[in-house]
Design a protein with these regions (language model features):
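Short nucleic-acid-contacting surface segments enriched for D/E, G, S/T with interspersed K/R
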Residues: 37-50, 174
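Flexible glycine-rich surface loops and low-complexity tracts that mediate binding to linear polymers
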Residues: 45-57, 225-226
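Beta-strand/loop nucleic-acid-binding surfaces
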Residues: 27-41
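Nucleic-acid nuclease catalytic cores
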Residues: 154-167, 171-203, 225
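OB-fold/S1-family single-stranded nucleic acid-binding modules
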Residues: 59-78, 235-236
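Active-site metal-binding core of divalent-cation-utilizing nuclease and nuclease-like domains
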Residues: 78-85, 90-96, 100-149, 168-171, ...
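Short aromatic-glycine-enriched beta-strand elements
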Residues: 16-21
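Domain-level recognition of nuclease-like catalytic cores that cleave nucleotide substrates
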Residues: 190-241
Length: 241
């Protein structure tokens, strides 16, 4: 996925979870933050952020904050995409290109977003029609996508805050598997260069427990990293889980 009209700015403050104040071309600008999560380890005073300009004259803010540079001692800054809508978009592009096959997710003949099942609404429902031994075979499954912006020393971690909704999704995915569907949770790591992914047990041990229980129930637990640039985000391949 790509962005248009990108500008570098200096982060100043975040008055609430929807907006931030930045310095752009020497002036203070209020911008929309495309991530309502805490992001406290990312949005630090004076850090470099990247904004996408909006052509909508009716908007209250002229820019969306979509990425940030994280300073690392002795290393170059790490560019992290923090657009909460991006993981689903790049996952869809990745699936439709057939690139999920290496991780057991087929190129779908049907890929439907925001599909309800049971008490949840999953990010994607997919079907794949094929032929085996001259017999038509229909595979079908659900995928829940989680965007990851937290890293510690090259380890990608999710979640960055407690998420009861995430726990519910994992339990529902296990129920999908029991009902005969294929099921997966895919963590889209919105940065490059990670050595592995792990559930953030320190922040939300219940999520880590639910993830392991789902895996034992047959839910695929996948993580993929991305090539992140100020104006683009693309899934590049798997990260060890």
């Amino acid at each position: 996925m790509t962005y248009q009209d990108i500008h570098a700015a200096r982060f100043l403050a975040r008055p609430n979870r929807f907006i931030a104040q930045v310095e752009l071309d020497g002036a203070v600008e209020t911008v929309h933050v495309k991530n309502t999560g805490r992001c406290r380890e990312l949005l630090l005073p004076s850090c470099t952020v990247y904004l996408e300009g909006s052509a909508n004259p009716a908007r209250k803010t002229r820019y969306d904050l979509v990425a940030v540079e994280k300073e690392r001692p002795g290393l170059p800054p790490l560019l992290i995409n923090m657009d909460a809508q991006a993981p689903n978009q790049v996952f869809r592009e990745w699936m439709e290109a057939g690139l999920g096959e290496a991780l057991g997710l087929p190129r779908p003949t049907l890929l439907r977003p925001e599909t309800p099942w049971g008490r949840s609404r999953f990010d994607f429902y997919w079907e794949r029609t094929g032929v085996s031994h001259e017999t038509s075979v229909l595979r079908k499954g659900f995928v829940e996508v989680k965007g990851c912006t937290l890293e510690e020393d090259g380890l990608a971690l999710f979640p960055d805050a407690p998420t009861q909704r995430g726990v519910k999704h994992l339990r529902e995915l296990a129920a999908c598997r029991e009902a005969g569907y294929e099921a997966a949770v895919c963590v889209v790591v919105q940065m490059a260069g990670m050595t592995a992914f792990s559930p953030n047990d320190r922040t939300h041990p219940q999520f880590g427990s639910a993830l392991r229980e789902a895996a034992r129930a047959g839910v695929r637990v996948l993580a993929v990293e991305c090539a992140a640039a100020p104006d683009s985000l693309t899934i590049t391949g798997p990260v060890p889980v």
